[in-house]
Amino acid sequence: MVPGVRIIPSLLGLVMFWLPLDSQARSRSGKVCLFGEKIYTPGQSWHPYLEPQGTIYCVRCTCSENGHVNCYRLRCPPLHCSQPVMEPQQCCPRCVDPHVPSGLRVPLKSCQLNETTYQHGEIFSAQELFPARLSNQCVLCSCIEGHTYCGLMTCPEPSCPTTLPLPDSCCQTCKDRTTESSTEENLTQLQHGERHSQDPCSERRGPSTPAPTSLSSPLGFIPRHFQSVGMGSTTIKIILKEKHKKACTHNGKTYSHGEVWHPTVLSFGPMPCILCTCIDGYQDCHRVTCPTQYPCSQPKKVAGKCCKICPEDEAEDDHSEVISTRCPKVPGQFHVYTLASPSPDSLHRFVLEHEASDQVEMYIWKLVKGIYHLVQIKRVRKQDFQKEAQNFRLLTGTHEGYWTVFLAQTPELKVTASPDKVTKTL
């Protein structure tokens, strides 16, 4: 137990007893919710503020469609570390990887939507984003690294008069003992668990089982399909990355600005060698360029893939052109760092650290028409990089084979006269 984290059970029980009664008595059915002299719209979620305790971060309230406020207590998952840490404005403590430099332990960013703050990894509903949705559809959002990702869910029709909100979903389910007993546990697991761990390789499931990651590429770009765990509901396929940019529609599917996909032609099916990008409502499609070199001697052609892959990568095929990563393997393991704060110059910087080298490599990418281009590579001594360590955070782990294949898909780089820098002109 972390000092200062203990909550008096009787006090929390009193809070939980008071919240539903007071909130429902003050709600305006079908319109908005009134709680603590503040007005909330359906789908909004918040931590209640009570005197004299202040904000109760271990309690979460949500305004429902019928104007009622549902409040529930969050439960913290068990931790497998000797010295968990407690961060401000959080309910649960978390483990910190002891191998991460202290300067890189930057708190994950929260999200702001409709004057409500959501923590990294938190799931919530925001119905007003899709006013033209069907009656059996709802809007589910997720906060990831300070960015809000939302999409439509099609919900099954409950076959009972009394319903409750599903955990990790915006759909409703029938009220029964199973749902009641698992609601708090499942919700807490998604909101405050380690699914979005700051170091994806810090978890260990077993001596021979690779630890999962929350990222789908060596650089940690957000995966296109946001998987939900709603019971019987449809997987979200619409992601809103930039609310001020126009989305694209192709073959009955909607893609947000900057999103990339393989088009489907009715006569031929999916086109794995064609890649389309949504650029502010315009579809920009081009042919995929396969790498000329592979980290293996005999790459194989696999059905559904445009480019050949190495046999060792077949088990990790996730039906995507982006190569998925697992935890670093020895030898040839790398750590990937990124800037803790967004860069104002539209450049994205990633630092690759090899444990066996006294240098790190800084890769600078530029976003051009929705596509990332590698524009510069710098080699910096580790001791010099440590001076800027507080500006970076650990993103993920990868190994040499995947990184080689990833870079092989970028435009050709020309080495300049300086041995410490590689540049390319767009």
Curated annotation (Swiss-Prot):
Q: Region Disordered: what ranges?
A: 182-216
Taxonomy, superkingdom = Eukaryota
PROSITE patterns, A to Z: VWFC_1 (PS01208), VWFC_2 (PS50184)
Polar residues bias located where?
182-191
Q: Name one Pfam family in it.
A: CHRDL_1_2_C
**Intracellular or extracellular location(s):** Secreted
Annotated Gene Ontology cellular components are: extracellular region
**Annotated positions of the Phosphoserine modification:** S182
Q: Where is the composition biased (Basic and acidic residues)?
A: 192-206
Annotated TM spans: none
> PANTHER family per the record?
CHORDIN-LIKE PROTEIN 2, VWFC DOMAIN-CONTAINING PROTEIN
The protein here is known as: Chordin-like protein 2
Q: Which residues form the VWFC domain?
A: 31-96, 109-175, 246-311
Q: Which GO terms describe its biological process?
A: chondrocyte differentiation; negative regulation of BMP signaling pathway; ossification
Q: Which gene holds the coding sequence for this protein? A: Chrdl2
* Low complexity bias spans: 207-216
Its assembly, as annotated, is: Interacts with GDF5. May interact with INHBA, BMP2, BMP4, BMP5, BMP6, and BMP7.
This protein's species is: Mus musculus (Mouse)
Tell me the leader sequence span. Answer: 1-25
Q: What is its main location?
A: secreted
